[in-house]
Amino acid sequence: MLRNKDRSSNKGNLAVTAVALQDHLLHDLQLGHLSVADPCKIKARKKEKKSKSLKRDATAIIDTGLRKSTEGPNMEDPEKEYVLDPTPPPLTLAQKLGLLPPPPLPLSSDEWERVKQRSLLQGDSIQPCPICKEEFELHPQVLLSCSHVFHRACLQAFEKFTNKKTCPLCRKNQYQTRVIHDGARLFRVKCATRIQAYWRGYIVRKWYRNLRKIIPPSDAKLRRKFFEEKFTEISHRILCSYNTNIDELFSEIDVCLAVNRSILQQLDERCGQIITKEDWEKIQAQAAHHEIYECSICLTPLSFHGDGRQAAIGTSSQRPRETVLLSCAHLFHNACLLALEEFSLGDNAPFHVCPLCRSCYQKKIVEC
């Protein structure tokens, strides 16, 4: 009887041990979908749990019209380090029975400091991310308990793809993660150093350009080129100092042209009328009434008087000088009037004025 009891207890212990080890393997390899339970029942249980959680979290809200005041900005340190998974995973049956060692406890702050120092000695934050092969820059960065460093987004994508919590480098299971900012700090220092280098180079180049503008070179060709540039710069500065208001000049030209057109139009109205033969006869009669016997330009007798009579000629060898009648009823020698018109061509062109009455005229040679 005792032997049978011992055998049955041993068989029960072996069964429990086998089940515990199988459960541990399923949890370790994350093969929950291989459970012997009906998958439809598992899905129904999950739906019931979700509905219960929704019912438990449902609360009635009454809109009173009052709005909560917006909270101020979070004044926490943006570079504060924190652990992402502080709670360890639940123990499996094999770990509870002592068949397998339990998972390690969460690391303390001192242990995290030692892990971080080991990562700094390895230079992981200086090197690119092992998953995406890109610099850390200002992207979120995580440190694993195995002292390896990755992008937070890259590690989450790796865990989602492999469906395991295993380090991509050393394959350590159930690691712990901590958010750090060493890569961002090193990237800021690198950017600041690069900006300072560019700024110093700009200052030195600017100082050297000003120095070249002041001190002439010793070489003859360069010295000649230096003074040519100086002379060009001074000439350009003088030209820029002049006030060349082209629009104002054009406006003045337009005003002058308008005034000249108005004057010419008035003169054309006064002097541009065509005088008929009857009008000339009236003008000649008016000139005879004035009794003009000599040219007012040369003060010599006219060869043809205003009354139509020919003047007496002293000698037969002298030819009579042509007499011209103006539209203002004045008489002159034709040669004298032409000389006067040629002399005063630039003053009253294209119209001429009578030497006596200063009015515009039209002329006609008086026939003997």
Curated annotation (Swiss-Prot):
Location, primary (coarse class): cytoplasm
Zn finger intervals (RING-type): 129-171, 295-358
UniProt GO cellular component terms: aggresome; cytosol; endosome; nuclear body
InterPro entries in UniProt: IQ_motif_EF-hand-BS, RNF32, Znf-RING_euk, Znf_RING, Znf_RING/FYVE/PHD
Domain of life: Eukaryota
Record GO terms (molecular function): zinc ion binding
Keyword presence, Chaperone: no
IQ domain ranges (all copies): 188-217
Region annotation (Disordered) ranges: 45-82
Pfam families: IQ, zf-RING_UBOX
Location(s), subcellular: Cytoplasm
Other facts noted in the record for this chain: No coding region alterations in either Hemimelic extra-toes (Hx) or Hammertoe (Hm) mutant mice was detected.
Name of the protein in question: RING finger protein 32
